[in-house]
Amino acid sequence: MSEQSALKTNYGALITLTTVFFFWGFVAASNDILMPVFKKELDLAQWQSQMISFAFYVDYTVGSIIYLIASSALKRDILSKIGYKKGISIGLGISAVGTLLFIPAARLESFELLISGLFVVGLGFSLQQTAANPLVISLGDPKKGSQRLSLAGGVNNIGTTIGPVLIALAIFGTTSAADAKASIESIETPYLVLGSAFLLVALLIMLSKVPNHIQQQESTEEVNVKKSVKDYPQLYLGMIAIFVYVGVEVATAGNLGEYLKVNFDMEPNQITPYVSLYWASLMIGRWTSAAGVFSSKPMTQNILRFVLPYGAFGIFVLINTITNQDLTPLYYYVFVILFMIAAEAMSKGNPARQLMLFSGLGIIALLIGIFSDGMVSIYALISVGLFCST
């Protein structure tokens, strides 16, 4: 057995890092609560309410460009210089500053300040993700790096599943935006608490044993160093894949509620569990893909491929049951999950094969959702989350 394959996952550092993954999901999904409320209170057009998501996600591109320019100017990778752990903490600090903008945004009922605050929060997330993703991959056997990312992504989707519920309860005293009685000013307290949490986690990470630098693993294989990005098709094709995946994920989440309202005459309080299941679907898929992290034994992995996804589905059921949502039409989704489990088993942990299978199933799900009706179309569109998950 090679030295690399003998490396064990650093679970202590991994658990600490997953806290920031949780925050990414918590805030991103909570935007779906802000969108309909600000649309109503500020009399926004549909395209303006969509700007809430746009302002949050576009800064990942902006942040990457800023990072690239700064690294080029310094002639050295910034995170290699300051450290990955420190980079995550700085990113959390930037996000905390963004939450402060929600105070004047609420008091002045300013749409511009609202999206500015979200932009700054997302800018901090951009730096956090730049540092955290490669750090997670480095915490053990490189061959299981993608599985550790899936596990961390599963924690991210715990945040996406419970975030909207907690934010709605904190702002409105209810889980349904349709029943909101509070004014826009009520966003101040929960986002101040969120900002404080960012700072607390930044401090905890700085004091933790999370490595500040990534140790390069020695390899006996001959390395063919290439000078141009064009020489690394897995890099630029991967960038295209991420662009498409994020576009599908965000567009589906942002418009699913409107689709159910227009085509099925659902009230906003009826829509809540469907949107929640969409986000939970990403958690279900990522937990399934992380089975290899827990054991290298094929039998154990096969068992976990069933236990983990249905455990994640159980979290969705628990959260929505506590908030008195009607889940009766959604229980049959357990059979849809079987398609994802089969695809994961067929991928055999190979990232390229997994990408091909999940992309194909995602396309099929979208086509079924477009050309069918009734619960079949709803299940198909929600299942897009399953196939965007890894």
Report each predicted region and the residues it spans.
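C-terminal ends and interior cores of transmembrane alpha-helices
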Residues: 90-108, 313-329, 341-344, 361-373
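C-terminal membrane-cytosol helix-exit motif in multi-pass small-molecule transporters
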Residues: 163, 167-176, 192-219, 318, ...
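Central cavity-lining transmembrane alpha-helices of secondary-active solute carriers
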Residues: 50-76, 276-289
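Glycine-rich segments within core transmembrane alpha-helices of 12-TM secondary carriers
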Residues: 144-175, 278
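Extracytoplasmic gate region of multi-pass secondary transporters
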Residues: 31-35, 164-168, 228-290, 317-327
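Conserved MFS/SLC helix-loop-helix module at the cytosolic interface between two early adjacent transmembrane helices
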Residues: 64-112
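Extracytoplasmic
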Residues: 12-44, 62-67, 163, 250-260
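Hydrophobic core of transmembrane alpha-helices in multi-pass small-molecule transporters
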Residues: 22, 98, 110-128, 243-244, ...
